[in-house]
Amino acid sequence: MRYTACTESGQNQCICEGNDVCGQGRNCQFDSSGKKCVEGEGTRKPQNEGQHDFDPIPEEYLS
């Protein structure tokens, strides 16, 4: 399963597969047609991955 890597601080930045970063209040979403930046929640991680809903963004994307 593929999923977004979102901040938990409300910045609404996601890294799609590869180095695509969604900004401007958009999130990444994966579906049968591939990846895209969309308004809203984006694609969530599987719930059995632990207490965090989203993966953190790597430090190099936050500067």
From Swiss-Prot:
It holds the Pfam family Hirudin. Residues 35-55 have a biased composition (Basic and acidic residues). Residues 53-63 are annotated as: Interaction with fibrinogen-binding exosite of thrombin. Disulfide bonds join 6-14, 16-28, 22-37. Its main location: secreted. GO terms for molecular function: serine-type endopeptidase inhibitor activity. Keywords: Disulfide bond, Glycoprotein, Protease inhibitor, Secreted, Serine protease inhibitor, Sulfation. Glycans are attached at residue 43. O-linked glycan consists of Fuc-Gal-GalNAc trisaccharide. It is found in: Secreted. Residues 1-3 are annotated as: Interaction with thrombin active site. Residues 35-63 are annotated as: Disordered. GO terms for cellular component: extracellular region. SUPFAM superfamilies: Leech antihemostatic proteins. InterPro entries: Hirudin, Hirudin/antistatin, Prot_inh_hirudin. The modification Sulfotyrosine is found at residue 61. Belongs to the protease inhibitor I14 (hirudin) family. Hirudin is a potent thrombin-specific protease inhibitor. It forms a stable non-covalent complex with alpha-thrombin, thereby abolishing its ability to cleave fibrinogen. This is Hirudin-P6. It comes from Hirudinaria manillensis (Asian medical leech). The lineage of its organism: Eukaryota, Metazoa, Spiralia, Lophotrochozoa, Annelida.
